[in-house]
Amino acid sequence: MQRIILFISIMSIIFSESGHNHNHSHENEFGIAIGVVPGHDDEGDNIGLHLHYVKGIGEHNDFGIGISIETIFDEHKHNSVSILGTYHFENGFTIAYAPGMLFEEHDGETEREFTQHFELYYEFELEHFHVGPQIDIGFDDNETHYMLGLHFGVDF
């Protein structure tokens, strides 16, 4: 039932905004996403937090590059720092790829390993702010996780 509601919500967003022209002329963005990370590391659901800064590049700032920090509030103190590349589509969707370093605590020691994240979010624009749904998928050596949440950005 939850998947059906999620699917209907996503399709509703896609078709309700298909005629809306999005403006990505801003040169900088500070964004935050908060969401649920289901079943991470065989635990129950956890809260995830994602912060990023992106500098727009190109004629209309459709592309961007920046830095990203992610944390999952779980028993293992899952934290990552990544370089972030983004592309803004004219229909309001943004995709991002973020390779970086994961820091995770196990048995009192901090382990480091390569991580990568793929993100997809939709922007409802409100002057210099935007808000919308986001999905974030993370791949590490030992596991894959995803976060379903809400993205909020400030454009300047």
Role assignments for model-derived ranges:
Residues 28, 59-65, 92-95, 123-132:
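Repeated loop/turn-to-beta-strand initiation elements of outer-membrane beta-barrel proteins
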Residues 26-28, 43-49, 77-81, 103, ...:
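Residues that define the transmembrane beta-barrel architecture of outer-membrane proteins
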Residues 32-38, 65-71, 83-85, 97-101, ...:
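Transmembrane beta-barrel strands of outer-membrane/channel proteins
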Residues 55, 85-87, 122-124, 137, ...:
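Residue-level signature of outer-membrane beta-barrel architecture
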Residues 1-26, 156:
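Cleavable N-terminal export/targeting peptides
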Residues 17-71:
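Short glycine/proline- and aromatic-enriched beta-strand/turn motifs that initiate or cap beta-hairpins
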Residues 38-42, 59, 71-77, 91, ...:
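Gram-negative outer-membrane beta-barrel proteins
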Residues 118-124, 144-156:
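Outer-membrane beta-barrel "beta-signal"
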